[in-house]
């Protein structure tokens, strides 16, 4: 596994949410690295909604060196995604709920994000669906057993607040959230910020909005999910290094990121898939809080 350092732009100001879930205890030391790695392996084994080997075909083309990733040079004359079995994957309930959420956000920071009732309903439908899965059940039970939450209901409420609560990255309107940053991506200060979800990347490339330039890392896993680092342009805006789980289910991504965000905030979190260890970097927003002193997700991505 190639280890890389990825930079994610963080918000400049944040505003608290109206949701007041039960306080989460500060018990970072109660989950050991071995326990976190073991749970991540359980997620990997339990991801029944992941893509099979024939469901996605990638066309990686050119591998960029460290000196080439920031140039914006297009080394790939073809698309990254040669084939995705949409009829199979996107018909699965958690994928379908995710796709419904991905058109709810403005591309650029600085524009206020409104959340009408229809979008709140889509958020709730997504959460309801992932909470039916074995992966999220395992995560919830782990958090309860370790004292992070007292119940699945309190965890679910906090999960919604940390991921979907709005804040501002521009000292202006409420224009961002952890979910928007990680799963949708944003244009911030003239660059692509966030965007760490393979489904959104695929949809952007399919619609002609993203131009794939090259890759700089390909994980050791032979099937899905795997981890990649890509260079791309969204419209004219460059992403020098963007890391992704590819072929994973939405519940897998949320579970891995949330596991590390809660237990190892603002840190490199050591996790494991198929016997191979890698890291997830998490960032919290430190200048403002929601609920009883808790922080929104700023970013989370694999390394």
Swiss-Prot record:
* Catalyzed reactions per annotation: ribonucleotidyl-uridine-RNA = a 5'-end dephospho-uridine-RNA + a 3'-end 2',3'-cyclophospho-ribonucleotide-RNA
Q: What is its EC number?
A: 4.6.1.-
Boundaries of every EndoU domain copy: 32-303
Name of the molecule in the record: Uridylate-specific endoribonuclease C
Please state which protein family the record places this protein in.
Belongs to the ENDOU family.
Coarse class of the protein's main subcellular location: secreted
Source organism per entry reads: Xenopus laevis
Q: Which residues form the signal peptide?
A: 1-16
Going by the record, the broad EC class of this enzyme is lyase
Which residues are glycosylated according to the annotation? 287
**Cofactor(s) the protein needs:** Mn(2+)
Keyword terms, alphabetized: Endonuclease, Glycoprotein, Hydrolase, Lyase, Manganese, Metal-binding, Nuclease, RNA-binding, Secreted, Signal
User: GO CC: one term?
Assistant: extracellular region
Q: Where are the transmembrane segments?
A: none
PANTHER family per the UniProt record, alphabetical = PLACENTAL PROTEIN 11-RELATED (PTHR12439), URIDYLATE-SPECIFIC ENDORIBONUCLEASE D (PTHR12439:SF43)
Superkingdom per UniProt = Eukaryota
Q: Where is the active site?
A: 181, 196, 239
Where is it located? Secreted
Q: Which SUPFAM superfamilies match?
A: EndoU-like
Q: Which Pfam families match?
A: XendoU
What InterPro entries does UniProt report for this protein, alphabetically?
ENDOU, EndoU-like, EndoU_C
Named from the GO MF annotations, one term is: RNA endonuclease activity
Its biological purpose: Endoribonuclease that cleaves single-stranded RNAs at 5' of uridylates and releases a product with a 2',3'-cyclic phosphate at the 3'-end.
Q: How does it assemble?
A: Monomer.
């Amino acid at each position: 596994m190639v280890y890389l350092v990825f930079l994610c732009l963080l918000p400049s100001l944040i505003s608290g949410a109206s949701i007041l879930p039960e306080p989460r205890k500060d018990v970072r030391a109660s989950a050991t690295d071995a326990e976190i790695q073991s749970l991540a392996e359980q997620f990997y084994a339990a991801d029944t909604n992941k893509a099979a080997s024939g469901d996605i075909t990638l066309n990686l083309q050119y591998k960029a060196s460290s000196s080439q990733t920031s140039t914006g040079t297009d080394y790939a004359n073809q698309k990254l995604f040669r084939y995705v079995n949409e009829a199979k994957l996107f018909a699965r309930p958690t994928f379908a709920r995710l796709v419904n959420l991905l058109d709810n956000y403005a591309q650029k920071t600085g524009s206020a994000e409104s959340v009408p009732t229809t979008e709140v309903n889509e958020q709730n439908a997504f959460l309801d669906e992932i909470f039916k899965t074995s992966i999220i059940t395992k995560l919830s039970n782990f958090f309860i057993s370790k004292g992070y939450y007292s119940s699945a209901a309190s965890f679910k409420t906090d999960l919604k607040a940390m991921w979907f609560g709005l804040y501002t990255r521009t000292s202006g309107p409420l224009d961002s959230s952890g979910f928007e940053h990680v799963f949708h991506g944003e244009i911030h200060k003239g660059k692509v910020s966030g965007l760490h979800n393979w489904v959104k990347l695929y949809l952007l490339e399919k619609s002609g909005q993203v131009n794939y330039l090259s890759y700089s890392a390909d994980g050791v896993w032979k099937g899905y999910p795997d981890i990649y680092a890509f260079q791309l342009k969204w419209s004219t805006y460059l992403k020098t290094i963007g890391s992704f789980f590819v072929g994973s289910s939405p519940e897998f991504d949320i579970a891995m990121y949330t596991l590390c965000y809660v237990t190892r905030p603002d840190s490199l979190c050591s996790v494991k898939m198929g016997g191979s260890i890698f890291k997830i970097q998490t960032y919290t927003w430190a200048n403002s809080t929601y609920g009883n002193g808790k922080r929104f997700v700023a970013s989370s991505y694999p390394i």
